[in-house]
Regions:
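Short, cysteine-centered beta-strand-loop-beta hairpins and adjacent loop/turn segments enriched
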Residues: 77-78, 105-113
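Solvent-exposed loop/turn segments at secondary-structure junctions
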Residues: 49, 57-59, 104-106, 137-139
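A solvent-exposed, acidic/Ser-Thr-rich amphipathic alpha-helical stretch
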Residues: 17, 21-22, 39-95
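A short hydrophobic beta-strand element
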Residues: 94-103
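Short beta-strand edge/turn micro-motifs at domain boundaries
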Residues: 115-142
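Short, low-complexity N-terminal intrinsically disordered segments enriched in polar/charged residues
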Residues: 4-45, 142-143
Length: 143
């Protein structure tokens, strides 16, 4: 009965090299905004309806609440540490991207103080990928 069926839509081919550069640029901007203690710039990573699943806390829903949480965290931070985010795996289908990455916290001297992994789900909206869900874990032993 395949003759009666409409032909399947052909999925657009994703240029994974280009996509990796685009998503890594988002991670680099996120890290730079954290270092600058600019909560609004960090929150620009997230969609308006995003949900962020952090360590040792309940999920935070919505860009405004995420921004507020980021602002509180940045205001409390007096260590001078900064984070580096790197893509480990990237998967794309249609307008969705799943990124699995690693993060490393460095002290002002550049020494590693903590590390872990994260997963971010991006959706392309108005021609731009925004994070709709993310979560992170630490690989460091409990303090």
């Amino acid at each position: 009965f395949s003759a009666c069926s409409a032909p399947a839509e052909k999925a657009a081919t994703v240029d994974m090299d280009k996509l990796k550069v685009e998503i890594q640029a988002k991670e680099d901007a996120f890290a730079a905004a954290e270092k600058a203690k600019d909560a609004a710039a960090v929150a620009a990573y997230y969609s308006q309806d995003a949900i962020s699943y952090g360590r040792n806390e309940e999920p935070i829903s919505g860009n405004a609440a995420i921004k507020e949480g980021i602002a509180k965290r940045l205001a409390k931070d007096t260590t001078g540490n900064n984070n580096v985010y790197k893509i480990v795996d990237l998967f794309a289908e249609g307008n969705m991207v799943v990124e699995i990455g690693s993060w490393t916290m460095l002290n002002p001297a550049g020494a590693e103080t903590e590390k872990g992994h994260y997963m971010s789900v991006f959706q392309k909206r108005d021609g731009n990928y925004v994070c709709v869900r993310d979560m992170n874990v630490t690989s460091s032993s409990a303090k």
